[in-house]
Swiss-Prot record:
Listed SUPFAM superfamilies: HybD-like
CDD domains, sorted: H2MP_F420-Reduc
Organism: Methanocaldococcus jannaschii (strain ATCC 43067 / DSM 2661 / JAL-1 / JCM 10045 / NBRC 100440) (Methanococcus jannaschii)
Family per similarity comment: Belongs to the peptidase A31 family.
Designated name of the protein: Coenzyme F420 hydrogenase subunit delta
Amino acid sequence: MNETMKAEIESQDDELFDLTPSYLKKEIMVLACGNILFADDGFSVHVIEKLNKILTDKEKQKIALVDAGAGAPQQVLTLIDENSKTKKIIVVDVIDWGIKPGEIKIIEKDELPNPKYHRLDSHDWPLAPLLREVAEKYNIEVKVVGCQAKYISEPDVYIGLSEEVEKAVDKAVEIILRELRGD
């Protein structure tokens, strides 16, 4: 067996045993954090579903749309390492900043809140420190598209968005599309 054949076989073996999630093999990740079972907490799921319908197949080759649910954003972010292709992460979530329900707030990496004073999401999980760490450690651009929730039913199940948050879905999609397409 010549060297060229050996190299080709080794390359195929590397691909067979590559356990890197597909979303870490793309340049841009849109990370939805939320749960449709808890009213406005489902905001990000509606946004990601609309983006999935609007983005072209060509765009999806470099953009990963990740519905991480309410509990998995931390797990997704902890899988990022120096081998990840990710250069930009856009997090979509409801926020609790005491602004008008349905209002969209764009949060840049440097504006990520100190969880002692503001919660990035409406849960008690401090996502902001992990986002900041990933951004700085791996030189990844991070933005959060947050929507002020009106009502989160957790722990009770309520499927559906409040009128204010439902109206904000299209606005968030427009903002994200401009960010993705450079418009």
